[in-house]
C-alpha cells in the first residue's frame, strides 16, 4: 500500500470527524420526518364534483284583469281633453310604430307626407353631424336653420338675414391677391370711414399692413402698404374716435405705438416694463382700449395678468409697482370697457375665468386672492368660470357680454336683468362653436359691432370651416358667410356702423364682405 501524504491524511480525518458530528446530531431522522410532512409531487388534488342542478322553467305570470270603471279611469269619450294632452306628448314616430286606427286614405296620405318630410330633415342634420364629427359649430347648420320657419318669429331678424344674404365677397380683386401682411394675421381693424375705406392688420412678426379698399378703379392690384413698427406679434389695432387719422397698435414686445395715416410715420406712446424686474424686461401688451368718457385715457392689459392706464397727453414714465393693478395671475387675452359705465371693465383670461371689475375701488385687500405678494387690485364684482381658458370678452352698448374660449361655446350674458352684478355670472345662452384653432390659426374671438346703423346688436366670429358666423344679441344666427373664402378668417371684425365684415387668415390674406 502506497504511503499517503500528510494533506490526504488530514482530509480523511476531517471527513470522518464530520460524519461522527452529523451522526451525533441525528439529522438523518430529522430529514426523514420533514419528508413525511411534505406533500408528494406526483399526488394531485381531486376536484369536488357537485351534482348538476336542472334549470327550473319559469312560467309566465299573466296579469290579473282589472276594471277601468272601478279604478276610476275615464275613457277617451268621457275625457277627450286629457286624452289629447297625452297624445300631444307622444313620441315623434309613435303612431307609425303603433298602428293607427285611421282608415281614411286622405288622412293616411297626409300623415305619410308629414313623416317623410320629418325624416328628410332629420337625415340632413344627421348626415351633417356625421361629416363634421365632434368639432362643429352652430353656424355649420345655417342653411337648415334658415329654411325652418319654426325656429324664429321675428320680423327684424328676418329682415337682417335678408340683408346679409345680399353680402358678397369684394369683387374688384381676387381675394387670393389681397395679401395684407407677410405672416399670420393676429389683429385686424376696419376704419370708421365709409367713403375711403381702410382695413389694417397686424401679424406675428410685428408688421402692420394697410389696405386702401376704395383706391382708383384702374388699379390692377390692391393698394397695400406694409410697415414694421413692432418687434413681436401685434395683439390689437384700433382707431380712436377723436383721431380717425391715426392707428394705435399694441404688441407683445411691450409697446403701444401710434401711426399717422397721412404721413405713415410711427411713434412710441407706451413701453411697459416689469417694475419687479430690470427696465429691459418688457410686459407684453395683450389688449388696449380707449375710455369712452375720456378720449385721452388709454387702458392696457398684459400677458402676465396685470392692468395699467395712461393719459396719452403726458410723457410716459417707467412703471412702478403701485402703477400696476393685478386682475389675473395668468395672461389676459382680452378685455372690454362697459360703454355705459366706463369704470367697469370685463377681462378674459388663460386662468379659465371671465371677471368684471370696478376701477374706482382699488386696494391691497382686494388682491388677497392672488398668489403674488404685495399686489393691488380693483374691486371684483363677479366672475364666470369655464372648463378651459376664456379667449375673449366684449361688452356692447345694451349691456350684453359675449365671450368664447376653448370649451367650444359662445356665452352671452345679459346684465340688464340684474340690479347688481352677481358673484357668479350665468350665461342666458350658450352656442356650440368649434374654437380648436391649433398651432397655425389665430385664436377665435367674438366681437360686437360698435355702433350698428340698423340698430341691430350683432357680433361676428370666425368659423373653422372657412366662414364667418354672425349672431344677434339673443344668440340667433343671422348669417354664415362662405363665398370664396379660401382659409379660416380667424381674426375678424365689423365696420363700426355699416354691415361690412372683414376677416384675416394665417397666410396674411383678408376677405371683405360688402
Curated annotation (Swiss-Prot):
Mapped WD repeat ranges: 180-221, 229-269, 280-320, 327-367, 385-423, 438-481, 483-514
GO biological process assignments: DNA damage response; regulation of DNA damage checkpoint
Region (Disordered): 26-116
Top-level lineage group: Eukaryota
Basic and acidic residues biased stretches: 34-44, 56-65, 92-116
Family classification: Belongs to the WD repeat DDB2/WDR76 family.
Name of the featured protein: DNA damage-binding protein CMR1
Species name: Scheffersomyces stipitis (strain ATCC 58785 / CBS 6054 / NBRC 10063 / NRRL Y-11545) (Yeast)
Amino acid at each position: 500500500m502506497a504511503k499517503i501524504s500528510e494533506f490526504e491524511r488530514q482530509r480523511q480525518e476531517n471527513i470522518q470527524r464530520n460524519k461522527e458530528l452529523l451522526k451525533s446530531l441525528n439529522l438523518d431522522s430529522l430529514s426523514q420526518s420533514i419528508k413525511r410532512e411534505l406533500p408528494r409531487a406526483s399526488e394531485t388534488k381531486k376536484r369536488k364534483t357537485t351534482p348538476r342542478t336542472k334549470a327550473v322553467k319559469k312560467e309566465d305570470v299573466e296579469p290579473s284583469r282589472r276594471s277601468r270603471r272601478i279604478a276610476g279611469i275615464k275613457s277617451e269619450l268621457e275625457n277627450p281633453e286629457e286624452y289629447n294632452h297625452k297624445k300631444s306628448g307622444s313620441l315623434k314616430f309613435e303612431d307609425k310604430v303603433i298602428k293607427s286606427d285611421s282608415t281614411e286614405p286622405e288622412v293616411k296620405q297626409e300623415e305619410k307626407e308629414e313623416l317623410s318630410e320629418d325624416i328628410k330633415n332629420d337625415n340632413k342634420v344627421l348626415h351633417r353631424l356625421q361629416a363634421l364629427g365632434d368639432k362643429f359649430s352652430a353656424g355649420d347648420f345655417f342653411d337648415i336653420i334658415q329654411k325652418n320657419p319654426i325656429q324664429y318669429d321675428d320680423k327684424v331678424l328676418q329682415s337682417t338675414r335678408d340683408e346679409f344674404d345680399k353680402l358678397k365677397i369684394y369683387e374688384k380683386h381676387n381675394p387670393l391677391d389681397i395679401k395684407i401682411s407677410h405672416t399670420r394675421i393676429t389683429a385686424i381693424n376696419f376704419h370708421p370711414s365709409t367713403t375711403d375705406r381702410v382695413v389694417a392688420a397686424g401679424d406675428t412678426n410685428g408688421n402692420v399692413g394697410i389696405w386702401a379698399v376704395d383706391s382708383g378703379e384702374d388699379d390692377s392690384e390692391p393698394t397695400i402698404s406694409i410697415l414694421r413698427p413692432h418687434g413681436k406679434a401685434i395683439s390689437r389695432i384700433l382707431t380712436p374716435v377723436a383721431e380717425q387719422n391715426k392707428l394705435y397698435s399694441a404688441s407683445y414686445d411691450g409697446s403701444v405705438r401710434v401711426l399717422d395715416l397721412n404721413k405713415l410715420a410711427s411713434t412710441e406712446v407706451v413701453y411697459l416694463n416689469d417694475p419687479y424686474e430690470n427696465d429691459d424686461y418688457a410686459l407684453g401688451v395683450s389688449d388696449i382700449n380707449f375710455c369712452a368718457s375720456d378720449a385721452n385715457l388709454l387702458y392696457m392689459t398684459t400677458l402676465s395678468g396685470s392692468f395699467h392706464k395712461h393719459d396719452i397727453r403726458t410723457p410716459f414714465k417707467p412703471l412702478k409697482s403701485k402703477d400696476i393693478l393685478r386682475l389675473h395671475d395668468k395672461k389676459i387675452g382680452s378685455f372690454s370697457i362697459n360703454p355705459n359705465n366706463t369704470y367697469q371693465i370685463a377681462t378674459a383670461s388663460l386662468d379659465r375665468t371671465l371677471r368684471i371689475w370696478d376701477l374706482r375701488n382699488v386696494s391691497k385687500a382686494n388682491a388677497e386672492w392672488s398668489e403674488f405678494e404685495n399686489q393691488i387690485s380693483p374691486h371684483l364684482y363677479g366672475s364666470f368660470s369655464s372648463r378651459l381658458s376664456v379667449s375673449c370678452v366684449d361688452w356692447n352698448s345694451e349691456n350684453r357680454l359675449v365671450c368664447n374660449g376653448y370649451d367650444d361655446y359662445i356665452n352671452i350674458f345679459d346684465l340688464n336683468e340684474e340690479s347688481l352684478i352677481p358673484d357668479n355670472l350665468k350665461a342666458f345662452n350658450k352656442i356650440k362653436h368649434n374654437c380648436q384653432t391649433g398651432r397655425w390659426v389665430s385664436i377665435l374671438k367674438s366681437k360686437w359691432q360698435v355702433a350698428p346703423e340698423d340698430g341691430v346688436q350683432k357680433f361676428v366670429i370666425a368659423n373653422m370651416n372657412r366662414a364667418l358666423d354672425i349672431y344677434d344679441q339673443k344668440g340667433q344666427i343671422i348669417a354664415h358667410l362662405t363665398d370664396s373664402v379660401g382659409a379660416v378668417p380667424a381674426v375678424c371684425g365689423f365696420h363700426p356702423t355699416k354691415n361690412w365684415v372683414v376677416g384675416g387668415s394665417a397666410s396674411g390674406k383678408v376677405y371683405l364682405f360688402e
